[in-house]
Amino acid sequence: MDNELRRIRAIAEYQFGPGSGMALFPDEVRMVYSRNTGRIRHIHLGDALIATFRPNDGVFTLTIAAAEHLLAKAPEFGYTVTVTEDAAQFVSQGKNVFAKHVLSAGEKIRPGDEVIIVAEKSGVVGVGKALLISDEMKAFKIGVAVKTRRGSETDA
């Protein structure tokens, strides 16, 4: 097995928990390297960009394609935030998630974690960075819970 593939799977396991490395990065992934540093920058599955490696903190940012792929392979994924259908239309346009619209959140979520935003009925609507722990997301009625990085309608 390729050392780089083992490395990105290990990072995913650290970031998202056991089993996520293989679920997110199967053997068919293709890595794109930075021209300046020669390090991994983007990971593609087929023609779709699924993750970008952030060298400043050593973790991945996900795309909508990665979120859908990950939830299909690992439905018990612990880094999901479920929002109301009313909020889902705005989140899919790239708007932030407010705490009052959060129905449930994975117990492992901490501020700064990469999370998948799902609507209660319509599936993945975005990905972003958690700003609160999971208990606060469910308890608070004001404030931003997740800073949306990509909405399902805005992700190209």
Regions found by a protein language model. Give the residues of each.
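Basic/polar, acidic-poor N-terminal "presequence/leader" segments
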Residues: 1-3
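Beta-strand/loop-dominated core regions that host nucleotide or nucleotide-derived cofactor-binding catalytic loops
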Residues: 6-29, 35, 45-111, 115-156
